[in-house]
Design a protein with these regions (language model features):
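Non-catalytic cap/lid and distal C-terminal segments of serine-dependent acyl enzymes
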Residues: 1-229
Length: 229
């Protein structure tokens, strides 16, 4: 679809004809075909064929933002903000109109897990459930020592910690599923976000899969079907 926000066509893949919509974000270097190529679409195919689930895989701007080491962090974030606005103001409304559904699930893993949590916390009226596997939730992992501009609003451990009661009520309407293996180097980020949700009174389902690394496709494929549709 042509995006006025991004200034070019944004590709996507759509699987299914009926049912709830599951939006699968790619990981850091992936494109719209990544989740199919690594078998994630296949593990929910029975739901797709039964008309219970539609899967939509949009392209990202990750290669032109976070993966481009020639860019300063402020420019990486500016480009990511364009992607967020594309999703919020163009893609999600179009999906709702085309599918006739207004209860989408947003899934992401690794960098996509951070994107899913950040997007849903900023636009909770657009998302009914978040599934974030093996994510990080402190933007400083991407920006290092820089934390200027709008960075605060893309760092869940910062902006959720300071949310007022009105915003807490809004994001509490979203179903939050945050998980990874307890052997993942990012496991502490999942613990931290889960504890933060608890302190703010935000219902969330948090899992640390015992005895496994968790930060890889076989684990994501194993656990995703548990949480859809």
């Amino acid at each position: 679809m042509k995006s006025g926000t991004v200034g070019r066509a944004m590709e996507f893949l759509w699987y299914g004809h009926a049912g709830r919509v599951l939006i699968m974000l790619p990981t850091s270097g992936g494109r719209q075909n990544e989740n199919e190529d690594f078998g994630l679409v296949e593990v929910v195919r029975p739901l797709i064929e039964a008309g219970q689930l539609q899967v939509v895989c949009p392209d990202s701007l990750n290669r032109e933002s976070w993966a481009d080491e020639s860019l300063p962090p402020e420019e990486k974030l500016r480009r990511h903000e364009l992607y967020d606005r594309f999703l919020a103001h163009e893609f999600f409304p179009w999906l709702a109109e085309r599918s006739g559904r207004h209860d989408p699930i947003l899934y992401g893993a690794s960098l996509g897990g951070w994107q899913a949590v950040t997007f849903a916390a900023r636009y909770p009226h657009l998302v009914s459930r978040v599934i974030a596997f093996s994510g990080f939730f402190d933007l400083r992992r991407l920006t290092k020592t820089w934390f200027g501009g709008s960075a605060y609003f893309y760092s869940p451990v910062d902006f959720i910690a300071n949310m007022d009661a009105d915003w807490v009520a809004r994001i509490s309407k979203v179903e939050w599923i945050i998980a990874t293996g307890d052997g993942d180097s990012l496991a502490e980020e999942t613990r931290t976000l889960g504890a933060l949700f608890g302190r703010k009174g935000i219902p969330a389902h948090v899992e640390l899969w015992p005895g496994v690394f968790g930060h890889d496709w076989p684990f994501w494929k194993q656990h995703l079907p548990r949480f859809v549709p």
